[in-house]
């Protein structure tokens, strides 16, 4: 069982580690607890496979692109008073989770296999520890008196 904050925090780091732009990674992280609540959290790992291409708006339709980017563009265009169609095969769970203002608190069941795969993506954002970085002031040093 994982809290909503644990889920969103890890999904944000994993999406950034996968190469997703910060704003889209934040959108996916916000949607993640809803996906966990709905029992479809495992889809997030598939969503971290690139490329993270934007959709194309052509004749009132959003065509192609990565599902997260396509849904985000669709939501933004609708908020701006336009009514585009979404020409992309995406999960209705993902659309609803990204549109939702609610943030389900949890706890939520998340498979360990999915959690480990997300951790692997998140680890790509870590900076390697070196003696030079420690000498330059990185880390807590020898004492941590916060």
Named regions from a protein language model:
Residues 40-103:
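A glycine-rich, acidic short-motif signal
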